[in-house]
């Protein structure tokens, strides 16, 4: 394999995959580095794509030639158009997806894309050309050096990642996977501001232990649409043997569930100050909801299948960082889940780097077509300036000045 590339993308999550594909399709020679080739495009949290606001973004990515829409359509097990009570501009497509098929489809599409090479390794250092004061490549955990004109960081939760379950803290980027070290320390040394954000995930449940008769069924749309303008990928619209959609189910918490959860608040890292990061605004944890909306006697939960051929269930709306015994005890007081068995518990996973890095100078940042930054993607091109492009896709050279995001 060549040791020099136009672009190196570090991290093969959804953002990294889109960045690599976009650059490769524009003629750049790309190296995609990931810690594990078997987890390319892993759906780390809920097995779904789109929804309010996010669905519009996926369709915009599709219009720009991205792959997310086609992959989502090909791996969908249910389609729903949300917000239909509002005007068409507010309609939000959402798919429930087969977790394994989603990742496999992404990998297949990347492998069929010219100009992309793959390498399984960690990156411990960004290399700098001191004469031009620009990125010149990366050094991997195995001691290899790859040269590049530009580097995109799409590390997700892996940069100095930490997992919290009750009073336990585990170093890791994802459950069962190690965190990545070296890049954060280097960026801090250069003067970048580092912070933490947090994301949580609910428990995965054995679907065979659920009493669905005590829940409400939620079918997909009778006339399903697609994310992509290329509708050939949808299993529901194929002319030969179209598939039936898999239903989701709805249940609710109750005061008894809330009281059980409260017994673990004294051991919750969120309430004890061990987690300082900001959480997603529209996806609060179950303990957040109980605290902030204490007047409510119940909160809606969605029982979502993880794929066509698995009994694993994702309990949407029940993310938390409480101890395992509190989780299970509360879970079994929810209608339909009285005999529920967990495959693995929920946890809170702070990221090692925040999504806003303020420019410390007024100098501009030169970006070209090869430098693509998507959600949770960080572009590092100049040194010692401190650029960060939260969501940028630029065709052609342009000079811009980055400023901090504000709500």
Question: Across the structure, where does each feature detected by a protein language model lie?
Answer:
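Conserved N-terminal/central alpha/beta ligand/cofactor-binding core
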Residues: 21-127, 142, 154-171, 178, ...
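Gly/Gly-Pro-rich "capping" loops immediately C-terminal to redox-active cysteine motifs
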Residues: 339-365
């Amino acid at each position: 394999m060549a040791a020099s590339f136009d672009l190196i993308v570090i991290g093969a999550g959804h953002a990294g995959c889109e960045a690599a594909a976009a650059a490769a399709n524009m003629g750049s020679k790309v190296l995609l580095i990931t810690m594990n080739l078997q987890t390319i495009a892993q759906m780390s949290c809920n097995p779904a794509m789109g929804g309010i606001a996010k669905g519009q973004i996926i369709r915009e990515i599709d219009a720009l030639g991205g792959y997310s829409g086609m992959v989502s359509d090909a791996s969908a097990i249910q389609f729903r158009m949300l917000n239909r009570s509002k005007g068409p501009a507010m309609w939000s497509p959402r798919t429930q997806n087969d977790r394994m098929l989603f990742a496999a489809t992404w990998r297949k599409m990347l492998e069929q894309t010219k100009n992309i090479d793959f390498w399984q390794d960690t990156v411990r250092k960004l290399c700098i050309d001191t004469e031009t004061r620009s990125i010149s490549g990366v050094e991997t955990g195995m001691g290899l050096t790859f040269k590049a004109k530009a580097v995109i960081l799409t590390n997700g939760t892996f940069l100095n990642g930490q997992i919290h379950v009750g009073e336990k803290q585990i170093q890791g980027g994802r459950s069962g996977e190690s965190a990545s070290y070296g890049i954060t320390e280097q960026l801090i040394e250069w003067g970048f501001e580092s912070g933490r954000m947090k994301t949580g995930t609910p428990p995965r449940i054995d679907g065979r232990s659920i009493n669905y008769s005590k829940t409400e069924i939620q079918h997909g749309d009778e006339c399903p649409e697609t994310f992509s303008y290329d509708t050939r990928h949808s299993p529901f619209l194929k002319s030969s043997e179209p598939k039936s959609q898999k239903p989701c189910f709805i249940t609710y918490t109750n005061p008894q569930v809330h009281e059980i959860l409260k017994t673990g608040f004294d051991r919750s890292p969120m309430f004890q100050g061990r987690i300082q990061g900001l959480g997603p605004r529209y996806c609060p944890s179950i303990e957040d909801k109980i605290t902030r909306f204490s007047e409510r006697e119940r909160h809606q939960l969605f029982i979502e299948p993880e794929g066509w051929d698995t009994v694993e269930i994702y309990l949407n709306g029940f993310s938390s960082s409480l101890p395992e015994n509190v989780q299970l005890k509360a879970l079994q007081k929810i209608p339909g889940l009285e005999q529920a068995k967990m495959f693995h518990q929920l946890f809170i996973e702070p990221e090692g780097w925040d999504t806003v890095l303020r420019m410390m100078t007024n100098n501009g940042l030169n970006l070209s077509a090869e430098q693509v930054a998507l959600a949770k993607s960080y572009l590092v091109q100049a040194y010692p300036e401190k650029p960060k492009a939260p969501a940028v896709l630029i065709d052609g050279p342009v000079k811009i000045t980055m400023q901090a995001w504000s709500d």
